[in-house]
């Protein structure tokens, strides 16, 4: 049945209501300009129904972006060969124009009846993402469902954002349920699997997160009114890495990624005196999952050309037989490789302790352009108590008060391995007071 232009547009807009509602809430008002609107699927009567993919250009926070969305109102967001063609075209245009790619996913997977045509379509989308990742900022948002092969976009996205009630699975949840009690909720996956970078509760929060990410990932100088010489009154020798992120970097500039996974490891984007930076932090023992989390983040920072600031308060790598037999060695090896091969400026700050591998892997002179430490920080192969038992075990055993003797020898060892001692040997560029952290980080960044 033939339709005139107005009828076609009216039918198409009606079939893409959900997508347009999301665009209206997240994108800048009236900024969306659609492309390839007439590439549409057909219903059983041969009439246009609107395609499972909507694409075009828009702006978020006055910053231009390329936009791609699957349409849950058409075959549950099932992607056809035509839909894949639209996706491939907007991805290519984003790469050519150097614009961030922002995708909104709500799909149950491929259209089964299209057979190999649908599979070939997914190949084009995955190949497009693989080309885009590392060249332009890639942000993927899951609002409803993400079932099937598009789940793998998480590994080719700088940010993989999910709404609280979103569901993510590589196959149908019905199939997964036969394998046991497995949750497909993004909020659970964020804690357990670690590929969800941010959880948002609504469109307003989603808009805020994307706006900040686009600003930071675009490697543009951010608008900044925060004094470069501001004293960080909230920092002290007992502050943790997240306190440093909040206190020392530009006010309201930071956004933590994968916050609920491997919580000993901090990964966040922020700015220092308007310069976008990637922030890595370790509080306590680093786990296999934490090492993997940091490695992925370093890869993203490297592809975006962002300087890396590493905050260290760690006693090394976790001692866990289960993790060792699984993936600990491999994940830590990958982390070492990533730090040593990323081609960006690197600054390290030892806040409390950098013991054993924590120093060598994260804070050493060999992988950092600038190395700083707080006054009172401790850098050594072992913690004081362990070193005392290893080196003075016989003397401690002979002592009338074993506990007091151990503390005595531990304190001597710690004094011999203080930050000041490391600085005298040339392993640190400076030893600073915690409340001067901001000034010295900015000065170090300017110097390199």
Can you say where each PLM-predicted feature lies in the sequence?
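Ligand-binding clefts of soluble mixed alpha/beta catalytic domains
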Residues: 1-448
